[in-house]
A protein has these predicted regions:
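Conserved N-terminal entry element of GNAT/NAT acetyltransferase domains
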Residues: 1-28, 171
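Acetyl-CoA-dependent GNAT
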Residues: 24-91, 95, 108-109, 114, ...
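Short secondary-structure capping/turn micro-motifs that flank functional sites
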Residues: 53, 131-132, 160-161
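Short hydrophobic/aromatic beta-strand or adjacent loop that forms the aromatic wall/cage
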Residues: 62, 162-167
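A short, internal acetyl-CoA/4′-phosphopantetheine-binding micro-motif in the GNAT/acyltransferase core
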Residues: 92-99, 129-131
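Conserved acetyl-CoA-binding loop-helix of GNAT-fold acetyltransferases
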Residues: 100-113, 117, 138-139, 146
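Conserved GNAT acetyl-CoA-binding A-motif
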Residues: 115-136
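Conserved acetyl-CoA-binding loop of GNAT-fold acetyltransferases
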Residues: 141-154
Length: 171
């Protein structure tokens, strides 16, 4: 009995101080996508790109997974299945107030498990390439590497005029 009370008490304390893991679920929330992207100007400074991501969040071509904490969406991911064997992580973003809590990793792990369970073998993601020196995107590349992605190739003029790094993760 004591250990159950202790565990229950620990959960209540975690909830009280806001460190409970978020709920990860499939949900479309274009408004939350816009809100989170607008709060990350180092990565999403182009209003047109934010408009496009907001539209993608409403598009059934994309699977939208969100992280919810105390009723608020604090993280978003959009994936698109190109072929049965492969998918693209089109967007992942976490509210800056929730960064460092493992939300991004939880979203990617959830997406990867869902895709793997559906027969997908490979997940790709595009980000600004290392030949364009930019500290926020250096953090993004390190995050992707830490979550199991490996660099495949870098191209210019793919998603923007500069270099794009394509990373892949075996599922």
């Amino acid at each position: 009995m004591t250990s159950q009370r202790s565990t229950s008490g620990q959960r209540h304390e975690q909830a009280r101080i806001g460190i409970m893991p978020p709920e990860i679920l499939q949900k479309r929330d274009p408004v939350a996508v816009r809100r989170i992207l607008e709060s990350l100007p180092d990565w999403f400074g182009d209003p047109g790109a934010i408009d496009n991501y907001e539209m993608a969040a409403a598009d059934i071509e994309f699977v939208s997974i969100v992280a919810v904490d105390s009723g608020n969406v604090i993280g978003v991911s959009l994936t698109r299945r190109h072929f049965r064997e492969s998918a693209e992580l089109h967007l992942i973003a976490v509210d800056p107030m929730a960064r460092g809590r493992g939300i991004g990793r939880a979203l990617i792990d959830h997406v990867a498990a869902d895709l793997r369970n559906d027969g997908c073998m490979l997940l790709s993601v595009h980000t600004v390439g290392p030949s364009f020196e930019n500290e926020p995107y250096a953090h993004s590349r390190a995050f992707y590497r830490a979550t199991g992605f490996h660099p495949l190739e870098e191209h210019n003029n793919l998603d923007w005029a500069g270099p794009i790094l394509i990373l892949v993760r075996k599922l």
